[in-house]
C-alpha cells in the first residue's frame, strides 16, 4: 500500500480511546468516508497498519488529507450519528442505501365514518395506520380485500359529504353506503373494528365473532344480515388460506433481512410479516459496497433502514448483528427486539426465500446492466460518439399555448437519473411558440452549466425536428458550448419506431430499424422527457385554471377558494352548485354566492 498523503502518525497519537465517529476527508475537504468505533484510536489506526484492506478502501486511504472525530457516550450513540452523517453527506466510499421514509401504509382516517386509504408520509393523528408495507401493491391488495369483506369506504371526505346517492362501489358491493345513511355509525364502526382485527392477525377470533353475530341474526330472523355475515366469513376463510402462515411463531411481527453479494453487486432483500400476514418483499441495492462483505452490507442496511422505519418485534437475519446495533434497534422501538441469526422451522424457510430473492434480483440487475451496456454501445456506434454515457433530453408541453412547461431528463450510468430531472415554467415565450420555449429552457439550463455549475452531458437530445434543432445549435453556439445535438423527429403518423434522427454535427439524418437497440434507448429517454413535461404541464394548467377562475372573483381569496373546493369536492362541484348551496358555506354571503354563480355560468 502506498504511503498516505498526510502525517497520519501525528493524528493517531492524539486520538482518544473512546467510542465515537470518524470522518476521512480529502485535500478539498470533501468527506470520503464516515465510520464508527468503540475505540477511535484503535479503529482509525487499523487503516494505516493493515495490509489486507480491500482495493476500494486502499484507494480511499491514498486520498486522505485529514481526519475529524466526534466522541460519543456509547457505541450505540456512535451508530446513530454515523448513519445520520452517511445520509446527510453521502460519502463516496460508504455503503449508502436510498432513504425509504416513503414506505406506504394503509390508513383509517379519524372521520366518524373512517375512510380507508393508501398513504405515504409521516403518520398523523387522529388517523390509524397499518404497515409499513414493502410496496404499494401490498397496500392496494389489502384495501381490495377489506373492501370486499367489510365494504369500507375509500372516497375522499369532500366527496363523502356531498353525495346524494350511492356510488358504483355500493352497487357492486364494495362499499356499505355510509354517505347516504345506508348503514348506521355503530354498524360501520363494527366493520372497521373487524378490519382492524384482521390486519392485526386475529383471524380466528374474528371469524368466531362473525359466526356468533350471524347466528344471532338468523335467530332474530334478520336473514339478510345473516347472509351478509356468512359471505364475510367465507371471504375471510379464502383469504386466510391464501395469505396467512400457520405457526404461532409467525403471529409475531417480524422482518426477514438477507444480504447477498454476487459478481460485485450487493443486494438486501427485506420480507415483512405483520399480524401473521406475509406482506411481500422488496430488494434494495446500495450505492457503493461492491467490494464489501455480506456482513458489512447487512449491518449498513439495518442501521440506515431502521433510522426511520418501524422496528418489528423480531429480525431474522443471515448474519450477525452486534450488540451496538441491537441496542440501537431497541432504543428506536422502546422495547426488546429479538435478533434471530440461525432460525429454525418456518423462519428458516422465510430466510432461505429472502436469500433466493436477493440472488434473483442481482441476476435481473446484471441482465439489465448487460442490456443497457449493449444499447449504449450501439448508440455510440450509430451516433459516432466516443464513450458517451450521459445524455440530456428536452421536451415542451402545453395545451394550445397554455401553461407551457419544458422538461430536462438525464440518462447516466446506464439508467435514468430522476433526482437530476428539472422542469422549467416557460415565461418569456409567446403562447404556442415552441421555438422560443426551447430557446428559453436551453438558455436557462446551459447558461449555468457553461459557467461551471454542474456537469455537461456528452450529447443533447431534442424532441423535435429541424427547427428545434436549429434553435438548440444557436443557443449552445452563443454559450460557447460544442455539444453533439440529436434531434428526434416524429415519423409518419407519429408512430413509434419511425423516428428520424437529425445529426447536425455529422450533417446527416438517420432512420434506424424498429428493433435496433440504440433506437430503443433513444425512445426510452425521449418518452421519459415527454412524460415529465406533460405531468408538469397538467399540474400547472390545473393550478392556473382553479386559482384564476375563483380568485378572479372579487371577494374570493385563497382561504374562501379552499373552503369552496373542500365543500364541493373540486371546481366542477362549485360550478354545479346553486346559489343557495354556495351561500351555506361559511364566509359566503348571499350576495357573494350570486357573484360566484354568475362568474361560473
Swiss-Prot record:
Q: Where is the GIY-YIG domain?
A: 17-95
Principal localization reads cytoplasm
Q: Which SUPFAM superfamilies match?
A: C-terminal UvrC-binding domain of UvrB, GIY-YIG endonuclease, RuvA domain 2-like
Which keywords annotate this record? Answer: Cytoplasm, DNA damage, DNA excision, DNA repair, Excision nuclease, SOS response
Entry-linked Pfam families? GIY-YIG, HHH_5, UVR, UvrC_RNaseH, UvrC_RNaseH_dom
Coiled coil segments of this chain? none
Q: Name one GO cellular component term.
A: cytoplasm
InterPro entries in the record: GIY-YIG_endonuc (IPR000305), GIY-YIG_endonuc_sf (IPR035901), GIY-YIG_UvrC_Cho (IPR047296), Hlx-hairpin-Hlx_DNA-bd_motif (IPR003583), RuvA_2-like (IPR010994), UVR_dom (IPR001943), UVR_dom_sf (IPR036876), UvrABC_protein_C (IPR050066)
Origin: domain of life: Bacteria
Q: Which biological process terms from the Gene Ontology are attached to this UniProt entry?
A: nucleotide-excision repair; SOS response
Q: Does the keyword Phosphoprotein apply?
A: no
Similarity section: Belongs to the UvrC family.
Task performed by this protein: The UvrABC repair system catalyzes the recognition and processing of DNA lesions. UvrC both incises the 5' and 3' sides of the lesion. The N-terminal half is responsible for the 3' incision and the C-terminal half is responsible for the 5' incision.
Q: What is this protein called?
A: UvrABC system protein C
Q: Which organism is it from?
A: Chromobacterium violaceum (strain ATCC 12472 / DSM 30191 / JCM 1249 / CCUG 213 / NBRC 12614 / NCIMB 9131 / NCTC 9757 / MK)
Q: Which gene encodes it?
A: uvrC
